Structures are given as structure tokens and as C-alpha cells.
């Protein structure tokens, strides 16, 4: 089973991190494997990529003619790849050496599997802020508290650790370009739509193998309270876009909100009474602030006319 790993990048500012991502893929224990690098419209970066990685076997390079966003770029990478499976990883993450081997084992042990994902663990470049609750790690693309059980079928895992049978992925059209980061647009949640379409076509969800591990770098700006509130707002906006495009996705969102308020917040309140600390108070406050920001973003989406058209332009 050949695997194509797609890495998309767009900025020289993250080139060092991107290079570490590439090296972690090239160091995988599994073969046969090819690496597909898609540079999203940055000619300067593409020249550097060609110099650094262009002469390595089983590395495919491509530069988009302009910045087209993460959804287009990842789909393009899958089209350029030749593997039976296509795996995605962010350009600010590093994979454990057995990442691909673990994903492939899951496919081989589950003949009906069409998508397999793994754990995305925070790699704190700066110190982890005490106020940041694990329930909201999803804001930074990492597995949050209660995300899923080992080998459970889930709607989707996060974009830095997800793989698909390549033919199925392309058959459903790949990622929806109405979603996902593009330039200065902040629409998130591009993983869910393709997984929903795959489920509707095949009846199969994503198998979550917690042993397939990717470490996601969290730079200092991603740990700032204001940035996380901003991110929460745009996540709420993105959820409104998702409701319009894929109303069937709302069940997972509602289940998460129910668990957050009725299970995790209650559990935190009990712990606060039994063993009070400043960090626990800060995290409780953050939960309510982030939740409110998500709500405001959703309402902003409700009030935005022609929302989907504006998102795609």
C-alpha cells in the first residue's frame, strides 16, 4: 500500500517549521511513501523548496499560480500523488516516526476503512498558558478533552492528522473550497465536509487511532487570550457556514456543547470546590468567554447576507 503525504505551505515566515515537517515525513519508518509539497502561490518559497528538496527521490513539488487556500491545495496534492492512501499534515507539525506505519496498519486490519486519522498533540513552542482549558484545544487544531476513544469511528479528525483512500477522496471531490483558510479569510472546519460526503457515499466514518501521533507546534501568538477569542469568533462564523452547506454536521456540534456544559463544566466546578486554584478559575472563565465568542461569531454569520457567496469570493 503506497502512501502519498501532502504538505501545503504558503509563507517564508514558517519555512523553518515547514522544513521540520518535511524532515519528519522523510524519516518515516514506512515504505513505499511519497511526499507531495504544494506551495500556495508563493514563488519565492517555491524556489527555496526546489533548492532544498527538489532532488530527493519520491518528492513531488507544485506551486499554485496564486494563493488558492488550504482546501484547494490539499486536493491538488492528492491529485498529484500516486499513492493508494493520501495523508495530510500541517506545515507547522511534526510526525512521529511510525505515524504512517500506524495508519497503514489500521487500513490493513480494517478492510472496509476509507479514512483513518490520529492524535494531534500540542507542541508548546512557548509555555502553555494556565488559563487555556483542554476542552478548547480544538481552537488550535489539537485533540480536545473527550475527543474520541481509541479505534472509535468519528466524523473527522483534525486536518494535521487525517488520511483517506485516495480514490474515494477524489471521487467525492476532495475538500470543499467554500471552507478552510484562504488568504485573509478565516473560515475554518474544512475537514468535516469531505468526511461527511465520504460517509454519505460509503457509509464509513474516520477510524481514530490514537497511536498515530502528530505534534502540532503552538507558537506564542496562539497562546494569547485575545487571539484565542478572535479564533473562537471565527469558529462560530465557520459553524454557520457549515450549517448552510452541510446541515447534517450540526449533531456533532450540539453533542459537544452538551458535554461541555453538562459534563466538563460541572466536573470543573466540583474540582474547584474540592481543590481550588487560580488556574482552575482562569480556565472556567476562559470556557465561558470562548463559548460566548463562538456564539457571537455564529450570530454574525446569521446576520451576514449571502454568506456562502462571500465566503467563496
From Swiss-Prot:
Which parts form a coiled-coil structure per UniProt? none
Family annotation (Gene3D superfamilies): Spore Coat Polysaccharide Biosynthesis Protein SpsA, Chain A
Query: Membrane-spanning residues where?
Result: 284-304
> What catalytic activity is recorded?
an archaeal dolichyl alpha-D-glucosyl phosphate + UDP-alpha-D-glucuronate = an archaeal dolichyl beta-D-glucuronosyl-(1->4)-alpha-D-glucosyl phosphate + UDP + H(+)
Outcome of gene disruption: Mutants contain only hexose-modified phosphodolichols and exhibit defective or limited motility.
In terms of PANTHER family, this protein maps to: GLYCOSYLTRANSFERASE (PTHR43685), GLYCOSYLTRANSFERASE 2-LIKE DOMAIN-CONTAINING PROTEIN (PTHR43685:SF2)
Query: Can you name this protein?
Result: Glucosyl-dolichyl phosphate glucuronosyltransferase
Principal subcellular localisation of the protein? membrane
This molecule's function is given as:
Involved in the protein N-glycosylation pathway responsible for the assembly and attachment of an N-linked pentasaccharide that decorates the S-layer glycoprotein and flagellins. Catalyzes the transfer of a glucuronate residue (GlcA) to a glucose residue already bound to a dolichol phosphate (DolP), a compound that serves as a glycan lipid carrier in Archaea. In vitro, is able to add GlcA to DolP-Glc in which the omega-position isoprene is not saturated. However, the likely physiological lipid substrate is alpha,omega-saturated.
Species this protein is from: Haloferax volcanii (strain ATCC 29605 / DSM 3757 / JCM 8879 / NBRC 14742 / NCIMB 2012 / VKM B-1768 / DS2) (Halobacterium volcanii)
Q: Which domain of life does the UniProt lineage start with?
A: Archaea
Pfam families with a match to the protein in the record:
Glycos_transf_2
Query: What GO molecular-function term can you cite, just one?
Result: glycosyltransferase activity
InterPro entries in UniProt: GDP_glucuronosyltransferase, Glyco_trans_2-like, Glycosyltransf_2, Nucleotide-diphossugar_trans
Amino acid at each position: 500500500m503506497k502512501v502519498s503525504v501532502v504538505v501545503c505551505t504558503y509563507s517564508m515566515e514558517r519555512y523553518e517549521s515547514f522544513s521540520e515537517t518535511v524532515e519528519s515525513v522523510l524519516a518515516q519508518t514506512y515504505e513505499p511513501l511519497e511526499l507531495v509539497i504544494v506551495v500556495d502561490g508563493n514563488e519565492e518559497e517555491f524556489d527555496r523548496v526546489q533548492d532544498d528538496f527538489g532532488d530527493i527521490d519520491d518528492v513531488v513539488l507544485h506551486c499554485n499560480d496564486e494563493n488558492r487556500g488550504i482546501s484547494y491545495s490539499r486536493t491538488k496534492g492528492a491529485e498529484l500523488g500516486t499513492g493508494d492512501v493520501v495523508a495530510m499534515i500541517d506545515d507547522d507539525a511534526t510526525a512521529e516516526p511510525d505515524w504512517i506505519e500506524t495508519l497503514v496498519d489500521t487500513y490493513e486490519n480494517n478492510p472496509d476503512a476509507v479514512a483513518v486519522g490520529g492524535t494531534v498533540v500540542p507542541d508548546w513552542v512557548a509555555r502553555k498558558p494556565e488559563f487555556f482549558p483542554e476542552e478548547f484545544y480544538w481552537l488550535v487544531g489539537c485533540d480536545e478533552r473527550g475527543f474520541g476513544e481509541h479505534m472509535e469511528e468519528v466524523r473527522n479528525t483534525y486536518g494535521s492528522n487525517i488520511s483517506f483512500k485516495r480514490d474515494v477522496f477524489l471521487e467525492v471531490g476532495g475538500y470543499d473550497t467554500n471552507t478552510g483558510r484562504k488568504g485573509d479569510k478565516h473560515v475554518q472546519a474544512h475537514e468535516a465536509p469531505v468526511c461527511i460526503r465520504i460517509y454519505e457515499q460509503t457509509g464509513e466514518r474516520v477510524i481514530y487511532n490514537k497511536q498515530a501521533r502528530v505534534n502540532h507546534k503552538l507558537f506564542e501568538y496562539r497562546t494569547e487570550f485575545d487571539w484565542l477569542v478572535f479564533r473562537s469568533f471565527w469558529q462560530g462564523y465557520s459553524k454557520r457556514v457549515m450549517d448552510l452547506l452541510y446541515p447534517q454536521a450540526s449533531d456533532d456540534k450540539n453533542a459537544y456543547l452538551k458535554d461541555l456544559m453538562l459534563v466538563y463544566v460541572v466536573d470543573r466546578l466540583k474540582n474547584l470546590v474540592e481543590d481550588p486554584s487560580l488556574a482552575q478559575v482562569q480556565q472556567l472563565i476562559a470556557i465561558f468567554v470562548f463559548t460566548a465568542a463562538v456564539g457571537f461569531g455564529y450570530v454574525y454569520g446569521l446576520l451576514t447576507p449571502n454568506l456562502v457567496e462571500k465566503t467563496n469570493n
